[in-house]
Amino acid sequence: MREALRVGDATKPSVLEVRTTDTCFRAVVAASAPVRAWFEDDAHATRGAELSGTSGLVPPRGPACARKGETLRLVVEPASPSIIARAVVWQAP
């Protein structure tokens, strides 16, 4: 996997466009207080399992994959607006 995106403010959804080939994503999220984090597609369907906590991998058990032409979003939902959250997203290939 290679780094695809660094997100300084992960409390806003981060868009990941799959342009050339089927792609799988994983992210590490770190927050100042517990958050919920997941990948979702254009239909708002969750791709992979959700993270609940202050830090960890999203999805926790393996990558979220998308087909060429699809768009995924990393969504980090804070419990309160004052939470600081950051993320790094990796992709393969």
Model region roles, listed by residue range:
Residues 1-4:
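A general sequence property marking short-to-moderate contiguous segments
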Residues 6-93:
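Acidic, Ser/Thr/Pro-rich low-complexity intrinsically disordered segments
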